């Protein structure tokens, strides 16, 4: 959920390398809402780039499935989403060194999507997407799986671990 990437996208979209981080979030959020509308996600409105709770920030499972499908249609994003881990500076090349509105650092990152990692909840057909948690939304996951050339998206809200992994597996098996 790297806000530094949202800032880089906003700066590129507006062709404004001097944009403040606060303005970046407004621009990126506007872009999110426009893209959601283009995808037919009519029961969603985004109020921030990070996903934390706001009364004006909401979605539904159908809309997240539409967004997840579009995400996975982007081959670069799909490759990133199925990675179990990453080490390096995730913002390298995205922001200029003199841009003091964005702080970067090296990361050792591991996926929180237990469907793609090598543990107890691994699902061999899982190919990504994104986990989340807030007190209001509980444990969530938008997950993708592919088997026999068919790709499915499962969206789980208001769950608790380990149920979100088991529910996603069950939805994939049902589908």
Listing of model-derived features with the role each one plays in the protein:
Residues 41-42, 53-175:
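Domain-terminus/edge residues, biased toward the C-terminal soluble/receptor-binding domains
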Residues 1-76, 81:
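Mid-domain, small-residue-enriched loop/turn segments at the edges of structured enzyme/sensor domains
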């Amino acid at each position: 959920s790297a806000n530094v990437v949202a800032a880089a996208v906003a700066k590129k979209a507006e062709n404004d390398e001097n944009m403040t981080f606060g303005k970046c979030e407004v621009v990126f959020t506007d872009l999110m809402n426009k893209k959601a509308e283009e995808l037919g996600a009519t029961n969603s409105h985004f109020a921030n780039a990070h996903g934390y709770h706001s009364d004006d920030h909401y979605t539904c499972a159908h809309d997240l499935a539409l967004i997840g499908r579009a995400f996975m249609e982007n081959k670069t994003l799909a490759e990133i989403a199925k990675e179990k881990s990453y080490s390096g500076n995730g913002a390298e090349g995205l922001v200029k060194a003199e841009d003091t509105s964005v702080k970067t650092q090296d990361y050792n990152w591991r996926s929180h999507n237990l469907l793609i990692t090598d543990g107890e909840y691994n699902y061999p057909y899982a190919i990504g997407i994104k986990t989340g948690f807030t007190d209001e939304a509980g444990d969530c996951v938008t997950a993708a799986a592919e088997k026999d050339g068919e790709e499915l998206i499962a969206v789980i809200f208001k769950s608790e671990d380990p149920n979100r992994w088991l529910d996603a597996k069950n939805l994939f098996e049902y589908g």
